[in-house]
Amino acid sequence: ATAPEVRKLRALLRQRDALREDVQRTVNRLEKANSTSTPQEVIRSLERTKSWLNEELARIEKLITDHTDNDPGLKADLDLLKSIKGVKDQVGREMLALLKDGMFKSASQVAAYLGLTPVEKTSGSSVRGRPHMSKTGPSGVRAKLYVAALTASRWNKQAKAIYERLVAKGKAKKAALGAVMRKLVHLCFGVLKTRLPWDENYVATA
């Protein structure tokens, strides 16, 4: 069963994402209202709504930070995840909530769940087009991993090697970043399993 502190973290992260969507929707409505003949009363209402949503979002963000800082187990896990170059608080907390759920036995299962496994378009017996990510699973986590992969492909020695090798082979940059995202998932899974911080110079041996 999932530990209560992990369930709480997941719930807080979901609420934060929902609030972010609400903020964006309100901003869009406000922009539309300001460009049309919308009554000032409605515009003021939207402005108050946006202000309240931003305050609530900041409050939830603080609750998330406090929760992971004040729980010794979560803090230790988050520190392990953040030892990986490219993994910072945002993606670290998402991966923490996902990996500590207990439903994954391997990093490959996590990558498949997040839709990071390459698939090929097929038509009859022929393969059409380049392989692409399946993009199943939660898009919010995938989006944060993508941002982390952009950083890792420049500053993380292991991730950079994968990225540069694939681009040199003629792979599309987006496909190379997809491979970096998978690598980050494997690294995150690895540090939590071994309880050892990431070692940039570690080379896996067969």
Residue ranges and their predicted role:
Residues 1-11, 34, 38-41, 129-132, ...:
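Short, solvent-exposed helix-loop connector elements
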Residues 1-80:
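Long, charge-rich intrinsically disordered scaffolds of nucleic-acid metabolism proteins
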Residues 11, 45-48, 52, 94, ...:
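Amphipathic alpha-helical interaction segments
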Residues 13-16, 20-23, 27, 31, ...:
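Short, amphipathic alpha-helical segments that act as regulatory/interfacial helices
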Residues 22-25, 59, 154, 158, ...:
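Intrinsically disordered or highly flexible coil/loop and linker segments, enriched in small
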Residues 60, 73-77, 88-92, 158-159:
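N-terminal alpha-helical segment
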Residues 83, 89, 94-169, 173, ...:
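Phosphate-backbone recognition surface of nucleic-acid-processing proteins
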Residues 168-206:
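Basic, amphipathic alpha-helical segments enriched in Lys/Arg and hydrophobic/aromatic residues
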